[in-house]
Amino acid sequence: MFKRILVAYKFTPASRKALEKGIELANDNGARLHIFHALDYRLKSLDESAPELIEISEETKLRFQTEAESLLKGFNNVTFGCLPADPALETCKIARLDKTDLIILGSHQIPEQSYISRVDYVGMTILEKAPCPVMLIPQ
């Protein structure tokens, strides 16, 4: 059913749940999984060869590897990318260019009201502009 799945990742518990679901669906469907993390938009003014941007990108990739290694458990049809960008618009752009079948997002729950989940501005923008279905995963 799905051949290309994109997880918008923010290093939060909600994003971790979204990643878990993305891995599960990619495994079940034999799909390729791409995880995207938007770096601070203000870094966009730097040249891509700027030492500061290279260092932040490498640190982010290492952090992802460290946090996700236990979840991936041998699943290797996965890529991770990060760059300075508007998180919502870049997620939709990646989905469009890659012909993504499904975008997966985490939604945050209010601790006192676990039956209520919320989606922030980035999530709402993705829901409005996505070129494919979007799946929301509660925390």
Residue ranges of model-derived segments:
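Intrinsically disordered or low-complexity boundary/linker segments at protein termini
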Residues: M1-K17, F75, T79, L102, ...
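Small/aliphatic-rich secondary-structure junction motif
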Residues: K3-S49
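Active-site phosphate/pyrophosphate- and oxyanion-stabilizing loops and adjacent acidic/basic residues
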Residues: I23, E69, M124
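Solvent-exposed polar/charged
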Residues: E24-N27, K93-R96, E128
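A short acidic, glycine-rich active-site loop
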Residues: E52-R63
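Short beta->alpha linker loops
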Residues: R63, C82-D86, P138
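Structural beta-alpha unit
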Residues: L72-I103
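Gly/Ser-rich helix-loop-strand patches that form or flank binding pockets
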Residues: R96-Q139
